[in-house]
């Protein structure tokens, strides 16, 4: 298994030509399988060319892991074939639901209850059994928390442990939720099982009101998210980190600048980890 490292980029058709023609590339790329499954010909060849430049991981949109309706087994089989075709070792999905009698075109929050933990965990286990690999779930941005019986961090942690799955820690979503629900973003990071974190997402958001942020993926990363990313590296270790940019897409040069900023922060975090390990070893030796 190839280990995921470094800084990745969510691949979008708007800058695919620039990506293919670039002299240097991100350490990995990510696509939503729904946007590519079933396509052959030119589209399949285009994606294959991209995969030659950087390893591919997948971030799904419509599994609806928390939805009220039965899992779409045919869809899951299609995802499995896509993962096999492109040798994708990481498939992540949102801890939310997207179907309720029809596709809702949004990521809706799951009630944070013990019953929901058990329900979602059972569905994740079923998906993992079909795919033959661990599912990676992502904490989502929310604007309401219906019928919550527990804090978000506890809910996410319980699902991870009960389903024996992994976490895509979206740092921007953590910050957005901390503002929207008046919670502590740093405490959320502290509460996550560090050994379950497979990789991170960062993105920009829009401030609509003083206490309302929208996760748009349509702007540069904001300073508070940079600070939270740095903290995540400090307490969780330096994890592979992917930049998402879906709207108001800037030039390729600007995207590369933001990727470079993440890389610099990772390098600094790795140096700090090394110093901490040396200090810990010296302290043990003295004792």
Curated annotation (Swiss-Prot):
Record's SUPFAM superfamilies? Xylose isomerase-like
Under the heading HAMAP family, the entry gives: UPF0276
InterPro entries per the record?
MbnB/TglH/ChrH, Xyl_isomerase-like_sf
**The name this protein goes by in its record:** UPF0276 protein ACIAD0933
Q: Domain of life of the organism in this record?
A: Bacteria
Disulphide linkage map: none
Q: What's the short name of a Pfam family annotated to this entry?
A: MbnB_TglH_ChrH
- Name the source organism: Acinetobacter baylyi (strain ATCC 33305 / BD413 / ADP1)
Which family does the record claim for this protein? Belongs to the UPF0276 family.
Please give the Gene3D superfamilies that the UniProt record associates with this protein: Divalent-metal-dependent TIM barrel enzymes
